[in-house]
Design a protein with these regions (language model features):
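Cys-dependent protein tyrosine phosphatase-like superfamily
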Residues: 1-110, 115, 122-191
Length: 191
């Protein structure tokens, strides 16, 4: 299996030059180093990690490994619970500024959760809406074409005791809210 497939590495959309998505590295130090080396071979300069503190426990120190591999000011940690959407304030004040800074610097950034599908997918869709001017539906469709699924939390909603229609509406609201925030995110970016 190619590393690209193993990590589910793909651009946010077919023509996206800066923002990419991926699965997490394996748990051993050697696997983390291989993941970092692979990302660097793809010219990735920044990382946005969506893993929760609980998910980081299995690593010796993943975020520190990223800081050593990419630089202390090139790592964004914005934890999102699995099968959930990002909190709007985290999207607007942490994640979008991270992605906007990468875009301004023309430095490729990879966003990752554990499987590289759901949490990563809806963040990539938010970027396409906020940073590239896509409509919500076009962003979701573009991300789905890359093998990610922004709707994963919607699909999982009944299993989590949530209404899937409300979850779908929440995703739409989140994407819509990300549109005007990008210029503000760029202005306030410290990433």
């Amino acid at each position: 299996m190619l590393q690209k497939d193993m990590y589910k590495f793909a651009a946010a959309s077919e023509n996206e030059p800066i923002v990419f998505g991926s699965a997490q590295p394996g748990y051993g130090d050697e696997q983390v180093n291989q993941w970092i080396e692979f990302m660097q071979s793809q010219d990735i300069k920044r990382v946005c990690c969506l893993l929760t503190e609980f998910q980081l426990i299995r690593y010796s120190n993943l975020l520190e490994g990223y800081r050593q591999g990419f630089g202390i000011d090139r790592v964004c940690w914005a934890p999102i619970q699995d099968f959930n959407f990002v909190k709007p304030h985290v999207l607007m004040h942490q994640i979008l500024p991270c992605l906007a800074a990468a875009d301004q610097s023309q430095e490729k950034v990879v966003v990752h959760c554990s499987g590289g599908v759901g949490r990563t997918g809806h963040i990539l869709a938010a970027w396409l809406v906020a940073g590239r001017g896509f409509s919500n539906n076009a962003a979701i469709a573009a991300v789905k074409q890359t093998g990610k699924n922004p709707y994963e939390a919607v699909i999982a909603a009944p299993f989590k005791g949530r209404n899937p229609w409300r979850s779908a509406a929440a995703l739409n609201t989140l994407l819509t809210a990300s549109k005007p925030s990008l210029s503000e995110a760029i202005d306030h970016s410290s990433f």
